[in-house]
Amino acid sequence: SMSSLMESKGYYVGVDVEESSIRVYNESLYYANIIGYTGKISAEEIQSLNTDSGENKYDTTDIVGKAGLEQYYEKELQGVDGKKTVYVNNLGKVLKEDSQVDPQTGDDIYLTLKTDWQKAGYQLLEQYVAGIVWSNTYDYKEFDNSQVGTNEIVIPVYDIYYALFENNVLSVSHLRSSEATELEKKVYNMFLDKKAQLFADLKAELISDSAKPYNELSKEMQAYITYLLDTTMTELGILREDAIDTTDSTYLAWTNDESISLRDYLTYAISKDWMDITQISTDTQFLDSDEIFSSLCDYLSEYVTDDNNFSKIVYRYMIENDQLSPQIECQLLYDQGILEPDDATYQGLGDGSVYSFDFIKDKIYNLEIKPASLGLSPCSGSMVITDPNNGKTLACISYPGYDNNRLANDMDEEYFSELVTDKSSPFYN
């Protein structure tokens, strides 16, 4: 216990017990967009805040506002650190206290917002947005909304099937984990087969003397190629972004006109030293272009196996091409614990007695799948309520919210990354 440690400090060299404070936000989901959060100060913030204050008030140990009111009222909320100078022996025992400066708390800020109104307004907003999604979802694979007015927007149910993977409702990493269920393992093996086929097709395209121009490839193949070039090969340093001449006619034919093949573009890139092929193989001196491209495909295929963003593209086209049925995808919502167990419905999805379209609409209607989770349009909203007698703001609501407790103090980096990439943009509503 803390008291026993304090009593035995002399026996534990370097061990001490200190009291510390952490920031805790009540009702975080409803207030996060207003209050923001705090975090450890950065070097840039130290320089900026010290310049603004005209003194060296901040150092590397400080916690400062990172967003919302916490950031806007940083100067008012930030107190003054206390200091104590002591002399200790080699066991850490205090021998003498030399000086002490007591800490000072910052100013308090009071809001006119009413928590009950915030919560009620948030729930109403969520229900309203869910109602729009529910009423505009149709049993279509695709629909051209450019031909209709804004009040006639259609959400094809397949957009929802895609969104379950694309917006991280379903975890692609869990499908390949050691804790995966039998159904998840089955789906992952389907993914591996699909990935093997797409890289075989890509390799065939790269070594073909009659390779198609980019604009004649399928949208699916274009999606894979775009990701592999713009993201994977650039991140790995295979495609040297800083070496590419963006005014080159061949580069423009690839990026703007889309009139040349991937084979022609990469062959040219190698000749211009835009590619570092030593990353693919250490013995490249005697390889011809076909062997280089074959090695490249094998290398990329292995590398992207654990790339969640690439996996999402593959799963999307598995669904679109009916290689992964919506029925199975809906069952995964139970396997991954997104939905509460329901054996009858799970079995019905498996034998076809429960139709995936009806299932999805029912889950949206009952808010078991929420608009923010899908990140489709619409997926957000806002509401402001004021007192007509005095103009005070009683509620200032933004949907969706987030848990700012997971960002304050010791930041949850994985959660922060999820928020940044979330298609419902919780940071910006």
Task: Go through the PLM ranges and name each one.
Residues S1-Y428:
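Periplasmic/cell-envelope proteins involved in peptidoglycan metabolism and beta-lactam response
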